Design a protein with these regions (language model features):
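Catalytic cores and adjacent flexible loops of soluble metabolic enzymes
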Residues: 1-143
Length: 143
């Protein structure tokens, strides 16, 4: 819960960085600060990732952002502009936290990520044909 806490418990950027440092001390090398219920806006992303990307520049730091259909691009723009190069995504944006107050909130949609960046940023092993097949399957399941 890197951008707020739906349980009304204490939260701040220093706390996130404190726990990232503790995890780094025991050998964790990859971090994915998470916007578990879609609280982050561009300013919150900037406030968190500006110090994180400086302090943890020797680590792989990504983003697990929950979005609504109208704000995924704003969040992706800000995180990418701050140096984030690894993003969690889900086909059709499915998944998310049941604590989110807005039922439109879900994971970053993989298809929007691909449309935004094109295939140039994807792993060499990524197959657009297999992804298209998975999209068709997801649409047949979820409607």
């Amino acid at each position: 819960m890197a951008f707020g806490n739906p349980y009304d418990e204490a939260y701040d950027v220093d706390m996130v960085m404190h726990w990232m440092e503790k995890l780094a001390q025991v050998g964790v090398r990859h971090f994915m600060p998470s916007d578990t219920v879609g609280l982050a806006d561009e300013r919150a992303i900037e406030v968190l990732y500006t110090p994180v990307m400086k302090e943890f520049d020797q680590y792989e730091v990504g983003a697990h952002l929950h979005t609504a259909p109208y704000n995924w691009r704003l969040k992706l723009d800000m995180a990418y502009d701050l140096g984030v190069r690894r993003f969690d995504c889900a086909i059709l944006g499915y998944g998310g936290c049941p604590m989110a107050k807005d039922e439109l909130i879900g994971n970053m949609p993989t298809e929007q990520f691909i449309n935004y960046f094109g295939t140039r940023v994807l792993s060499k092993s990524f197959s657009i044909e297999k992804f298209a097949s998975a999209m068709r399957g997801a649409k047949s399941i979820f409607g």
